[in-house]
From Swiss-Prot:
RNA polymerase that catalyzes the synthesis of short RNA molecules used as primers for DNA polymerase during DNA replication. Keywords: DNA replication, DNA-binding, DNA-directed RNA polymerase, Magnesium, Metal-binding, Nucleotidyltransferase, Primosome, Transcription, Transferase, Zinc, Zinc-finger. It is an enzyme of class 2 (transferase). Mg(2+) 2 binds at D319, D321. GO terms for cellular component: cytoplasm; DNA-directed RNA polymerase complex; primosome complex. Its cofactor is Zn(2+); Mg(2+). It comes from Mycoplasma pneumoniae (strain ATCC 29342 / M129 / Subtype 1). It holds the Pfam family DNAG_N. The gene is dnaG. Belongs to the DnaG primase family. This is DNA primase. Its EC number is 2.7.7.101.
């Protein structure tokens, strides 16, 4: 191998195709490139392209891409240096020159960043131990009731009141780092030191952190990358002060305590705050991570999939407030769509806002007991949609739609049936077989690319609900999803939705309101509702016919006179769209017809909004 003289030359020598194949990913030739199942999301149809000419990979579903080094970084969740070394090893490239030269130029900055933070962790921990207890240790042990073991486990430290005076001299004389720390590295970023940490202001001579408990934050591999400082004084307006955002410290890409999780864990608890993590840890729940915000990023999902390979269940245990409840529903949908079983802690109108409050009020036993009170997917969703005021039919449809997004669940017949049983029991709606059939139909409507196959996966039912009689289990047969199936299925789905009795024309959500409209109200009420979706004049004629024959409101009669599915909707529009895409042979993409059919759904939404508006006008 010729020693490279530029970064581009080094990357050219690290070929992408053999690196991808090293991870047992099968490449299939497609033109000049290769395609493969993407390892970074639940890919059922090859959506990752590997370009030999460009020496890169790109997934057009999850948008992950890059060169060979980036691929290793993503799949192994390692830093650039480790990925480079592994790439050279995979390709049997002897390039000590490349390692020495380029790691000095690129990677040492990141390594230095970690080393500086390690020194800071050590410094703040030492401060906590050396300063009088009332400066910080008393706050942790008495006010926050944390044990010495928890304090040590999380490397908690203290930025004491005199940091303005002692911070710089202490760090500049810190002996366990080479080369020695420079003042500019600790101050705010400059042109010479763009990676400076921002812990001291040279102009004002003020330390960024003082009178705060310092909580070290690590990246997903356990390297220290930042801090969050918890104010000790109640008068301090800013309760938590974090390290400045940096290319290596992006809160949205981090999970507090992730690097300490048992990599063979089956269940992971997801909470909001640092002290919530401390509360669960104090109660003996070690596999708990804290969100650095209220959202999960793609890097979080990849970390779950790549580093927690045995993970089956994520328990959402966010705060018991409006923001926590809203975030729970969003996170549930995201995790569920990635094939993760989701449970939700049942706060059950508890008086406490979060785990820290519960821990301080009732202790670790109460925390541990609460972690065992969880709702499964269906139990949570039924309760959630009830708070939104949805009736049983709408709730069933929404719950089944969410279940159908999880291919791991729908591939397990027993678990799917169990969830349908729970849904029927909670709502006393329909019957189990009907709901199960609806779920099977809905899972086929989940968006897929041109051709894919659903196959039976390893059973998960027993691990969740115990051993049961599985005699009724039927092994799933592969179902080929073709272009014709997609078009036909989506057309039928759209047609059913626009013709459904409760959203058809102006029937929508309030049948009685429409029936009670007098003939004199019709012209004014519907005059402005001209849309290409239906024939307004024909609707008015039908309504007048009803009032001419019937003097008392009667929905059944009104419905029959209206003619339901034949009165006003131009069915030929949908039929033409269906025929167009079935006959279309070039440049076919499943999303093409979706945009056209979505037009009709948007009109339905518009009808609902208009109905609500006009109803309010009539009532007032």
């Amino acid at each position: 191998m010729t020693s490279p003289t530029s970064l581009d030359q080094l990357k050219q020598q690290i070929k992408i195709a053999p690196i991808v194949e090293h991870y047992a990913i099968k490449l299939k030739k497609k033109g000049k490139d290769f395609v493969a199942l993407c390892p970074f999301h639940a890919d059922q149809n090859p959506s990752m392209t590997v370009s030999v000419a460009k020496n890169i990979f790109k997934c057009f579903s999850c948008q992950v891409g890059g060169d060979g080094i980036a691929f290793i970084q993503k799949i192994d969740q390692v830093d650039w240096k480790t990925a480079l070394n592994k790439a050279l090893s995979i390709l049997n490239l002897d390039s000590q020159y490349a390692v020495n030269f380029y790691l000095k130029e690129v990677d040492p900055k990141l390594k230095r960043y970690w080393d500086l933070h390690s020194a800071l962790v050590d410094y703040y921990q030492t401060r906590l131990k050396l300063e009088p207890k009332e400066q910080g240790l008393t706050y942790l042990t008495e006010t926050r009731k944390l044990s010495p073991q928890v304090i040590e486990r999380f490397q908690l430290g203290l930025a004491f009141t005199l940091e303005d005076q002692y911070f710089l001299p202490s760090l500049l004389n810190y002996p366990w780092i080479s080369p020695a720390i420079e003042k500019a590295e600790l101050c705010f970023a400059t042109e010479k030191f763009p990676e400076a940490l921002g812990f001291f202001n040279q102009q004002t001579h003020y330390a960024t952190f003082k009178s705060r408990i310092m909580i070290p934050i690590h990246d997903l591999k356990g390297n220290p990358v930042g801090f969050s400082g918890r104010a000790l004084q109640k008068t301090e307006k800013i309760k938590y002060k974090n390290s400045a955002e940096h290319q290596w410290f992006k809160k949205s890409e981090l999970l507090f305590n992730f690097h300490r999780i048992d990599k063979n864990t089956l269940k992971l608890y997801l909470v909001e705050g640092y002290f919530d993590v401390f509360a669960l840890t104090s109660a003996g729940i070690g596999d708990v991570v804290g969100l650095m915000g209220l959202a999960l990023s793609e890097s979080h999902i990849i970390a779950f999939q790549q580093q927690l390979k045995a993970l089956e269940t994520v328990v959402l245990a966010l705060d018991n407030d409006t923001a926590g409840h809203d975030a729970t529903f969003k996170l549930l949908q995201e995790l569920n769509a990635h094939g993760i079983i989701v449970e939700v802690v049942d706060w059950n109108q508890a008086a406490y806002k979060d785990w820290d409050e519960l821990f301080l009020a009732e202790g670790s036993d109460a925390v541990k007991a609460k972690t065992h009170r969880v709702l499964n997917l269906v139990e949570y969703l039924v309760a959630y949609f009830k708070t939104k005021g949805f009736d049983e039919r709408i709730t069933v449809n929404k719950v089944i739609d969410i279940i159908a997004q999880n291919q791991k669940v729908t591939a397990d017949t027993s678990f799917s049936r169990f969830l349908c049983q729970k849904l029927q029991q909670l709502l006393q709606y329909s019957d189990v077989e009907t709901l199960f059939t609806q779920l099977q139909q809905q899972k086929l409507k989940v968006k897929v690319n041109k051709t894919t196959t659903f196959t039976q996966r390893a059973p998960i039912y027993e691990s969740v609900v115990g051993v049961v009689d599985n005699s009724f289990r039927n092994e799933s047969q592969p179902v080929a999803i073709t272009k014709e199936f997609l078009v036909e299925n989506n057309w039928k789905e759209t047609k059913e939705r626009v013709f459904h009795a409760e959203i058809f024309a102006y029937v929508l959500l309030d049948k009685q309101f429409l029936v009670e409209l007098k003939q004199s109200d019709l012209d004014e009420l519907f005059a402005s509702l001209q849309t290409p979706l239906f024939d307004v004049a024909l609707f008015i004629d039908k309504a007048r016919l009803y009032w001419a024959k019937v003097q008392e409101p009667d929905w059944a009669v009104f419905n029959s006179i209206l003619g339901e599915q034949q009165a006003m909707f131009p069915t030929t529009f949908l039929a033409q769209i269906k025929e167009f895409f079935l006959n279309k042979s070039l440049s076919y993409d499943p999303e093409d017809y979706e945009e056209d059919l979505q037009f009709f759904r948007q009109l339905i939404v518009k009808q609902k909004e208009l109905l609500k508006y006009f109803k309010s006008m009539v009532e007032h």
